[in-house]
Every structure is written in C-alpha cells, then in structure tokens.
C-alpha cells in the first residue's frame, strides 16, 4: 500500500497504562517533537451553533447533566441527580440538558419526570452532531465519566466529573476537569475495580462545587 512507516502502541499493556501519558509520549516520539499539549480547542460550525441557540435562554445558567455512562458502576444514579437538580432549582435560575445514550433514555425520562420545575431537556434521542453544539454552548458539565465531558472541557467549559470507578487518567488532560471522588478514596487508586457506590459522593459536595465554579 506504499506505507513506509507504521507506528503503534505496545500490545497487551493496557493494565496500569496511563492513557494520556502514553498518548503524549507516543505522539512526541512518532513526530520527533519535544512536547505535545493535551489541551485542544474544539471548533463547531457557526451554522450548527446558531441552530442550537434556540434551545438556550441567556438568563439561565445552563448545565449539561451527564447521567449516562458505559457501565452502571460508573453512574452516580438517577436519585442523586434528581435531588441535585431540585436543590439547584431552589437556589437559582438554571436549565438542564440531560445527556444519556439512546439505549439509556429511561434514565433521562425518570430524571425529568421527577424534577419539580420543568426546566430540563432530554438529549438522549439526538445524534452526536446535534448534541455537540449544545455542549459547546452550555455553561457547565456535571456528571459521570462519559463522552460529554471530553467535549465540554475542550470547549473551555468547567466540567465536574464524578469519578466512582473510573481511572483518573480519563480526566487528566485538561485544567477544565474538576473531579469529585468518594469520601476517603484516593484519586491515584481509583480504577474499574474500585467498587464504590453512588452514594459515596454526596449531593451536598456536588452542589457546593457547582456554586463555587459558577460564582
């Protein structure tokens, strides 16, 4: 095929592999450069931005709620998000965009049905190209380790990531990540086998972090 040089990660070494550091090293070595910034700038076409603006009111503080994720052990849980949203609604003008995958739309539905103030929008039926402009226009991300926080951080939005049983490496690359971990947990020791329960991160702790970053 005329390919003169092929670069690849070492095989069978994912365990204990720091994904960000490994990618950084691989890129520097492959391109023969000294450093490779991990912060990027995510660009969205103006046409898509303008189309998404119809879902926004500038008088509100607009938060994307990342309620879905790839596995149930990494989810903070519907009850916690419901309590958090209701508490925020008692303390300010907010609007919430509930993000889950299409196969997890019951999570979005259950959350929205139990919010006293009807100020939520379900993103679960939208495709990625429709969701990204909304993420880029939001003021903040709050939620599980899911694809949305990777977009919001690179759109320079503060992103509160609730790390239950996800490695820290997944959110190590951006200053816009604000991680909340279970009580008595150590960030360096979190991984997919940690087995922390959703209630090990309190609603009050998340609420206070939102207020802190918002002010």
Residue ranges: model-predicted function:
Residues 1-215:
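Catalytic machinery of carbohydrate-active enzymes
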């Amino acid at each position: 095929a005329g390919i003169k040089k092929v670069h690849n990660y070492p095989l069978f070494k994912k365990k204990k592999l720091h994904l960000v550091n490994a990618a950084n090293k691989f890129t520097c070595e492959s391109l023969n450069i000294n450093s490779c910034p991990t912060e990027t700038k995510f660009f969205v076409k103006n046409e898509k931005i303008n189309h998404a603006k119809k879902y926004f009111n500038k008088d509100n503080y607009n938060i994307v709620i990342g309620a879905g994720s790839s596995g149930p052990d990494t989810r903070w849980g519907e009850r916690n998000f419901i309590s958090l949203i209701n508490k925020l609604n008692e303390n300010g003008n907010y609007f919430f965009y509930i993000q889950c995958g299409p196969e997890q739309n019951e999570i979005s539905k259950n959350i929205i049905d139990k919010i006293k103030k009807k100020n939520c929008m379900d993103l679960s039926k939208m495709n990625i190209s429709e969701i990204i402009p909304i993420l880029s226009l939001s003021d903040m991300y709050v939620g599980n380790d899911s694809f949305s926080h990777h977009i919001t951080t690179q759109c320079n939005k503060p992103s509160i990531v609730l790390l239950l049983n996800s490695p820290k490496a997944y959110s190590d690359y951006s200053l816009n990540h604000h991680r909340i971990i279970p009580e008595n947990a150590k960030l360096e020791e979190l991984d997919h086998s940690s087995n922390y329960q959703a209630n090990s991160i309190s609603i009050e702790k998340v609420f206070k972090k939102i207020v802190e970053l918002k002010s």
